[in-house]
């Protein structure tokens, strides 16, 4: 008994947090950087951005269905026949959507059908519970520096990503540049897994495993434990990048100028001795749609600066696709006097603020797009922005809509639910007025059937 206890305690002591590699200086031309990826892409003068919301496997399945549906609607971008799935430059993923986003970045168009086989058809949730209840994992879970969030990372490694780091992803990705987001539970701030963001922590993102970022983004509080990230701020000479300095010169009193200062001169993480660690949880708590990443950039830069940046990269069209897997918040508690259950209270505590914040982000983004396009009428080189919003709530009234909106947030869905979400994605893409308008403006390639009919007509 004493020997067994000694082995147990020894195992616990061996499980310690492994810090991410630090940097001694910022290297702006190296690493997994968003701006570098944009500079190296855009061969067709069109910037295509995908956004996959949170929502567990429901979100991953709906996003996968949208990518599959886009392949049925080819379009012309600068005379080149392509699809949005094949042409995506950036993908933002949050919580369940981050699983698909990271895999899409790694495999590109081959995400179809690989992701369905490797993830959607697997009972990922059962595998997780099996690991959590395994006797062999109990010593590790007894460690104060190892938790269920770390087990989630291991399961993502076993199922999808292996030991791939962001350095590997930077070298070998076949798809769009992925921005995975989590939430710092102490500050409530969004943490994007890009080297631009990790510069402030004086950390080398290339050393971090992709599965850890996805696990952090997916770590729903209470169900999973937070994932730890070390903070080395103040030890690499980091300053606000030169490209941002211009927007900080003004001391005006406008709300936008105050917001710029708040975003760019945030001192919260500057003292790594006071805050040596971050504890990361579900990215959906701060930005369940992924839209805030773009809204923050719009708040930092004046439209004239954004215009100049896009023109410098020869971009004349921006396409933003938002896939929103938000389900129906139960209203049954309003139909009876009985005190809601503990589960109902937990769900309301998490889901209601997320739903309200998502609606506000959606309204702000639509207003931003409208204002941008209105300003382009007088631009010397107009840059058209298309916003394709695809939400389960936009499905037409039908049994399918009812079923889709009542699919729970879990990491396993039965085959029927996966098929419902794929069918829902087809309908949303087909009925989207924004997507159909984009196809009209960009041009639709001739289908083989139409070409054959035209050839027959010419013969006669």
Language model regions located:
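Sec-dependent bacterial lipoprotein signal peptides
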Residues: 1-13
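Catalytic domains of lipid- and phosphate-ester/thioester hydrolases
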Residues: 12-460
């Amino acid at each position: 008994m004493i020997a067994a206890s000694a082995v147990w305690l020894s195992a616990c002591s061996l499980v310690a947090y492994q810090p991410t590699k630090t940097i001694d200086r910022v290297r702006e031309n190296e690493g997994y950087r968003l701006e570098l990826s944009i500079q190296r892409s855009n061969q067709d003068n069109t910037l295509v951005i995908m956004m996959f919301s949170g929502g567990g496997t429901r979100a991953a399945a709906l996003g996968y269905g949208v990518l599959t549906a886009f392949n049925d609607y080819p379009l012309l971008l600068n005379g080149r026949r392509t699809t949005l799935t094949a042409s995506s430059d950036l993908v933002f993923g949050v919580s369940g959507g981050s699983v698909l986003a990271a895999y899409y970045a790694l495999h590109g168009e081959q995400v179809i059908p690989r992701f369905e086989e490797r993830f959607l058809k697997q009972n990922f949730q059962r595998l997780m519970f099996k690991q959590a209840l395994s006797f062999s994992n109990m010593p590790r879970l007894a460690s104060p520096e190892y938790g269920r969030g770390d087990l989630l990372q291991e399961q993502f490694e076993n199922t999808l990503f292996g030991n791939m780091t962001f350095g590997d992803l930077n070298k070998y990705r076949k798809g769009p540049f992925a921005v995975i987001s989590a939430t710092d539970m102490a500050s409530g701030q969004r943490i994007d897994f890009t080297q631009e963001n990790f510069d402030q922590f004086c950390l080398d993102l290339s050393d971090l495993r992709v599965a850890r970022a996805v696990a952090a983004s997916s770590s729903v509080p209470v169900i999973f434990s937070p994932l730890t990230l070390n903070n080395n701020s103040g030890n690499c000479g980091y300053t606000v990048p030169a490209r941002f300095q211009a927007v900080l010169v003004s001391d005006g009193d406008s709300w936008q100028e105050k917001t710029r200062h708040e975003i760019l001169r945030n001192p919260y993480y500057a003292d790594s001795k006071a805050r040596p660690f971050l504890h990361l949880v579900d990215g959906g708590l701060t930005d369940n749609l992924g839209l805030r990443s773009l809204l923050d950039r719009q708040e930092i830069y004046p439209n004239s600066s954004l215009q100049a940046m896009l023109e410098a990269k020869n971009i004349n069209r921006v396409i933003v696709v938002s896939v929103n897997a938000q389900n129906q918040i139960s209203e049954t508690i309003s139909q009876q006097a009985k005190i809601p259950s503990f589960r109902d209270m937990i769900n309301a505590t998490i889901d209601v603020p997320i739903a309200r914040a998502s609606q506000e982000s959606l309204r702000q983004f639509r207003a931003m797009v409208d204002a941008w396009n209105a300003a382009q009428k007088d631009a010397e080189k107009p840059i058209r922005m298309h916003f394709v919003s695809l939400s389960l709530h936009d499905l037409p009234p039908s049994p399918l809509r009812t079923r889709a909106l009542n699919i729970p947030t879990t990491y396993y869905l039965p085959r029927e639910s996966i098929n419902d979400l794929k069918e829902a994605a087809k309908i949303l893409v087909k009925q989207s007025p924004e997507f159909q308008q984009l196809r009209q403006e960009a041009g639709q390639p001739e289908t083989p059937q139409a070409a054959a009919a035209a050839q027959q007509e010419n013969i006669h």
